[in-house]
Amino acid sequence: MPPVLRTVAELRARVSDWKAAGETVGVVPTMGALHEGHLSLARRARAACDRVIVTIFVNPRQFNNPADLEKYPRTEAQDAALLASVGVDAVFAPGPEEVYPRGFATNVSVSGVSEPLEGAHRPGHFDGVATVVAKLFGMTRADRAFFGEKDWQQLMVVRRLVADLNIPVTIEGCATVREADGLALSSRNRRLSAEGRARAPALVRAMQAATEAMRGGQAVPEALAEARAAVLAAGFETVDYLELRTADLLLPMERLEGRGRLLAAATLDGVRLIDNIPV
């Protein structure tokens, strides 16, 4: 089993030894409740770096709904066993007081890319993400950090953060891992009922159908409206957004030209699912 480190001091001591030996360090930031998507990130890090740290921290600052924070699954023993199978070198699993000690007063906010989509529906969420990620980069002194493309907006926020603050870490975006029926892997999926789980792939299927329609010449607003209707018809309670944007997310696309990203968030069984695909 990989050692589970609880304090920044323990982590820094270990990383200092690795750096002194000239070894490269990769980090995979997670909130635990690990699944094959997370493990694929750890394997990618394992292949690219001499040493791999997986962080497990349920970050209270990125939950704008306290009930969601309480419901978030915490499965550390199971997570550690999964990470042992991948061969990570250390798990960093601090408590909230270690990450945000008494007197902590700094908030990192990335303008622009953090504002639409998730930012509009979850105020403050990306401030919490940016703050904890900046701290984790400082704590781990990582050379490379691995993030899933499933959270595309988060990936764009982290890239902007690193570029703007000259943080010396390379951000690696890794392809979304999906179930056989197309559903993007997510820790939230375990909260779906059996019926909800069967309905859930309708989200990505509607997105794929819209993509094909737009590539075939259908007007973007019409294709998106049909996709939204299909998601609701499949049993989803709400669709927060279903938008075509430039890959950097800064601008909505009214017509299909250049690289775009189709992004969606919808609620099923009271569980909010997000997904995105390239267009």
UniProtKB/Swiss-Prot annotation:
Write out the GO cellular component annotations. cytosol
Underlying gene: panC
Q: What EC number(s) would the UniProt record show?
A: 6.3.2.1
Subunit details: Homodimer.
Q: What is the official name of this protein in its record?
A: Pantothenate synthetase
**Binding sites annotated in the UniProt record for ATP:** 31-38, 148-151, 177, 185-188
NCBIfam families cross-referenced by the UniProt entry:
cyt_tran_rel, panC
Classification via PANTHER family: CYTIDYLATE KINASE/PANTOATE-BETA-ALANINE LIGASE, PANTOATE--BETA-ALANINE LIGASE
Per UniProt, the enzyme's principal EC class comes to ligase
Q: What does this protein do?
A: Catalyzes the condensation of pantoate with beta-alanine in an ATP-dependent reaction via a pantoyl-adenylate intermediate.
For this protein, the record's Gene3D superfamilies field holds: HUPs, Pantoate-beta-alanine ligase, C-terminal domain
